[in-house]
Amino acid sequence: MQLKDAQLFRQQAYINGEWLDADNGQTIKVTNPATGEVIGTVPKMGTAETRRAIEAADKALPAWRALTAKERSAKLRRWFELMIENQDDLARLMTTEQGKPLAEAKGEIAYAASFIEWFAEEAKRIYGDTIPGHQPDKRLIVIKQPIGVTAAITPWNFPAAMITRKAGPALAAGCTMVLKPASQTPYSALALVELAHRAGIPAGVLSVVTGSAGEVGGELTGNSLVRKLSFTGSTEIGRQLMEECAKDIKKVSLELGGNAPFIVFDDADLDKAVEGAIISKYRNNGQTCVCANRIYVQDGVYDAFAEKLAAAVAKLKIGNGLEEGTTTGPLIDGKAVAKVQEHIEDAVSKGAKVLSGGKLIEGNFFEPTILVDVPKTAAVAKEETFGPLAPLFRFKDEAEVIAMSNDTEFGLASYFYARDMSRVFRVAEALEYGMVGINTGLISNEVAPFGGIKASGLGREGSKYGIEDYLEIKYLCISV
């Protein structure tokens, strides 16, 4: 792999300021999803190494939380600057291990860095309260303190941003963190922690443990020194982790599955709706928890929208993310390909028609697909595809589409396009989702609270609210 700074390609885990192999010497192979080639290996660590990382985090905690907010902020600010300075290398690493086009990878690095920049400033805005006393001789004060040692388990689809959204607020609050990245995409995490080290983040404050999900995750949830876990991934695994954390009453933040509706009303600007659908559906090849999974189009504009969407999809260029001009890379692996094929076959068997795409090209490359006349009984109406499949459902009126949109256990992101302002407010308030994109298909940023309701999770990331999950509220009652 050709990088300007070869030291960013790390094949060891980072624990307590040291680059280490697994105790037993075992490794995990990391492959390029575009070529199938082995990029390298990382240590297959387990319980013992994870425990040492947690103990190092606990040992580093007193000194880190004792720093002033301004001192922690300065170190985070330097980490942000190093990410921007090394954006090209970080993006190339990401594209190689994850597959997304280089332009998207560069965008993710900027997005990931924005959380470090934001929380570097939020570190200095952790305010308490003074409450009027309930008696003349009482003074009531509320302060906020770091929760302690924290843990994070992050996914492969956004291997940099999902880390900084968690590590940024944790470190800003004065907490320490042990991170377990996805085994498919560990190199982005290891490069980020190398830059954190260069930024002056002390040993033990941020460690990265690669290896067995069961053993590493089990120690993170089972070790009583860990006071909070943040996880991004499937609802099934989120439930399991929540159960494991219950033993020690750990604080838990969960960003789980989604099944986002994307609604096009008959008064929408169709060109803008198509533009938003392309961004929402096909960004990262549909492998995002907030991507449009169900596209609902009102009867009067259904055919026109489908035609315009097909024309836009035809312009997408599929290929290796490192090749210039590529807009759509591979899916992460064969299981992801199989899920897309399964949803297409199920929908077609129930009456849907393939308007465009629908076929495997080779390896992990799959054609961006549009299905029309999709019935409500299709699996894709209930299940998250996590791939480049856009199923178009018809609807008659506002009440019908709101009912269909809310008919799911998930509640992460939703989108709709409309011009009528009364409708905008009615629909936005009626949709049972943590986030609503109105006349836009791209809603994620560092200043807004990201998170879902129902089975899509607990807590929020980003924004002024993101740091709250890493703080404990303490009330002081003073007699004067």
Curated annotation (Swiss-Prot):
UniProt-listed GO biological process terms: gamma-aminobutyric acid catabolic process; L-lysine catabolic process
Keywords: NADP, Oxidoreductase
Pfam families the UniProt entry points to: Aldedh (PF00171)
Catalytic activity: 5-oxopentanoate + NADP(+) + H2O = glutarate + NADPH + 2 H(+)
Cited Gene3D superfamilies: Aldehyde Dehydrogenase, Chain A, domain 1 (3.40.605.10), Aldehyde Dehydrogenase, Chain A, domain 2 (3.40.309.10)
Pathway assigned in UniProt: Amino-acid degradation
PROSITE patterns listed in its UniProt record: ALDEHYDE_DEHYDR_CYS (PS00070), ALDEHYDE_DEHYDR_GLU (PS00687)
GO molecular function, one term: succinate-semialdehyde dehydrogenase (NAD+) activity
Entry annotation: catalytic residues: 255, 289
EC number of this enzyme: 1.2.1.-
Task of the protein: Catalyzes the conversion of 5-oxopentanoate (glutarate semialdehyde) to glutarate. Involved in L-lysine degradation.
Identification of the protein by name: Glutarate-semialdehyde dehydrogenase
Source organism: Pseudomonas putida (strain ATCC 47054 / DSM 6125 / CFBP 8728 / NCIMB 11950 / KT2440)
